[in-house]
Amino acid sequence: MLRSIMRRFKSTNNLSKKPSDYYVVLCPKCYFVTSAEVSVAEYIEMHKNFNTKFADRCPNDFIVTNSKSWNNHENCSALFYPLC
């Protein structure tokens, strides 16, 4: 499943980039995933919008210490993955 998610975000326009330059962010409870190029605040807003469209809401209350970027990969309870 994770491989199919990673394939979803691989762009054919940026094939010159190294695979380690691609990152995605995944909510471990509802499996909402998006590119890590968005800020943490944008991710949380997208996550809320995603979950309002479905009957079962995600119980994940994000703990955010830095809302501007995904630096150090420890600032949010979402998971930060490099694409292989």
From Swiss-Prot:
InterPro entries: Alphabaculovirus_Y056
Database matches in Pfam families: DUF2719 (PF10891)
UniProt-recorded name of the protein: Uncharacterized 9.9 kDa protein in LEF8-FP intergenic region
Source organism: Autographa californica nuclear polyhedrosis virus (AcMNPV)
Organism taxonomic ancestry: Viruses, Viruses incertae sedis, Naldaviricetes, Lefavirales, Baculoviridae
